[in-house]
Amino acid sequence: MINISFPDGSIKQFAKNITAYEVANAISMSLAKAAMVAEINGELQDLSIVIDNDCKLRILTAKDPECLEIIRHDAAHLTAEAVKELFPETQVTIGPAIENGYYYDFARDKPFTTDDLAVIEAKMQELSQKNEQVTRELWDRDKAVEFFKSIGEHYKAEIIASIPAGEPITLYRQGNFIDLCRGPHAPSTGVVKHFKLMKVAGAYWRGDSRNEMLQRIYGTAWATKEQLDSYLLMLEEAEKRDHRKLGRELDLFHFQEEAQGMVFWHDKGWSIYNTIEQYIRKKIRKNGYTEVKTPVLVDKSLWEASGHWEKFRDDMFALETDDKTLALKPMNCPCHVQIFKQGIKSYRDLPLRMSEFGLCHRNEASGALHGLMRVRSLVQDDAHIFCAAEQITDETVSFCKLLTEVYKDFGFTDIKVKFSDRPEIRAGSNEVWDKAENALKEAVEQAGFNYTLNPGEGAFYGPKLEFVLTDAIGRQWQCGTLQMDFVLPERLDASYVAASGEKKRPVMLHRAILGSLERFIGILIEEYAGRFPLWLAPVQVAIATITSDLNDYALEVQKALIDNGIRTDFNISPDKINYKIREFSNQKIPMIAVIGKQEQENKQVAIRRLGTTDQEVLSVEQLIAVVKEENEKYL
């Protein structure tokens, strides 16, 4: 007999060589019917797994969050099965679960069309309703290679051939379809009920642009119809808020082929950019940061010394001049170390907080570029804190508080923290890592955050915090980071004189709040759906006259607003007032100042705020005071 421990703390005895499904059935038939996979000693397994030793067992159903990835992986196999039934000449390659869904890559001469997707989806529904049994099979590697070659699946054969000889190969069979997979999978295709195929895109075999182009079908799959409907509704809303669309409509920026991944900022977009920079500058000065500016083009010798040349060479723009190789900086940190090294630094100088709106360039693949979210030229709200080891906790707490203030001012209050600890390959002793990780954990807790652990995901040179925002439609955006670094000060020979008189290496904290200004503005456009708050809006007050004989007064009002630093626009054309109001509303201007005869006589304006039809009559001085008060909260 074996002892099986359950999540409720109970322990039950079963005969050896019992399957997880049989255990579930012994507990209750309803549990066995709903069961998808088993968690045995913390590892997910098929329900068909034979248990022959004492263990901890959890039976998982669609209600458990871990099963969402299983459903999506099952949906990927179901997609491939449907494609093979409909288009037998197609070769299958790989199909993993990803965030919010899955994809499967296919090799096929003829491109898949939108109509094809509808047919494939219908076939998937049919296969799901058949509730085909899914079985796991162990194969010899060489036999598996020969089998897949014999059925014309050369990509699959290539993958299997790359697996070391002697390793067992697991294949999963459902109906007439068989696929290489580690698993686990649910016991039948019927668990995949709530799904939708989204789009087709190109993808290179093995992600290498030198290889052939495949066709990638993206899909989404969920545990319930409500979850699927909610996700599709969110996508509809996201499409309306797409920053690329709103960027064009609101005349904020554009991109063009002659400068891929580089933003052409228009007047209104540049106003937002500068306002954010002004806001951040005020915050960092208040928090004891100095601001610096470092070169954009730097000799490769510095990048070699820092280690960036070895790791990021392919992502850097380089050029040859005067027998030298120069590179556009992809990040600011090595340049900040050069400033730190100017003159002797004492322990009394620490912590030294050095910030820069640093212009960086990264050679992103053209297919990866995506509006403001993924560009080649970007400005980071970057800063590096040079400190002693004993200052790490206090500096991290201060940073967390600053970051929280900033996010709150932009309307983000749901902030999640991910903590990435030591990877297998790393610099520094376990003792150094223990102290570093404990310092960050203590700081995060002091700052009032809970965190989720990303085991082994830290950089080789130190642990990391990532700060994730949730936007108005539930999407998550990783923006802020704090990365501890023991290595760069050593590589670039940065030091300070300790109280004892000995020379020590500072710890370097790389930190950013927004990430890049370009990406953060893209996030804000979508968060606000283009309706920027008054202090941030590119045009704060638009002036509209009812009749042309009021134009002189309108220009007086505009001058008074501009003289007080208020961003304005006006329409004194002969157009109807309703048309003017509608046009300014479409531009999402927060305040429209309507001027009629009565407003002129009383030196007033009638204010209509965006999204309302109510009007509030203010004197020009009162209007100026309202806007200035809002500006002064942030700027």
From Swiss-Prot:
User: Any note on cofactor binding?
Assistant: Binds 1 zinc ion per subunit.
Annotated TGS domain ranges read 1-61
Q: Does the keyword Cytoplasm apply?
A: yes
Does Disulfide bond show up as a keyword for this record?
Answer: no
Compartmental location? Cytoplasm
Name the cofactor(s): Zn(2+)
* Any one GO MF annotation of this record: ATP binding
- EC number(s) per UniProt? 6.1.1.3
Give a GO cellular-component term: cytoplasm
SUPFAM superfamilies cross-referenced by the UniProt entry: Class II aaRS ABD-related, Class II aaRS and biotin synthetases, TGS-like, ThrRS/AlaRS common domain
The main place the protein resides is cytoplasm
A single GO BP? threonyl-tRNA aminoacylation
Q: Which UniProt keywords apply?
A: Aminoacyl-tRNA synthetase, ATP-binding, Cytoplasm, Ligase, Metal-binding, Nucleotide-binding, Protein biosynthesis, RNA-binding, tRNA-binding, Zinc
Residues that bind Zn(2+) = C333, H384, H510
Q: Name one Pfam family in it.
A: tRNA-synt_2b
Catalytic activity annotation = tRNA(Thr) + L-threonine + ATP = L-threonyl-tRNA(Thr) + AMP + diphosphate + H(+)
* Region Catalytic: start-end pairs: 242-533
Leading EC class: ligase
Source organism's superkingdom?
Bacteria
Oligomeric form and interacting partners: Homodimer.
Could you tell me what this protein does?
A: Catalyzes the attachment of threonine to tRNA(Thr) in a two-step reaction: L-threonine is first activated by ATP to form Thr-AMP and then transferred to the acceptor end of tRNA(Thr). Also edits incorrectly charged L-seryl-tRNA(Thr).
- What family does the Swiss-Prot or TrEMBL record give for this protein? Belongs to the class-II aminoacyl-tRNA synthetase family.
Task: Quote the protein name from its UniProt record.
Answer: Threonine--tRNA ligase
Which species?
Rickettsia africae (strain ESF-5)
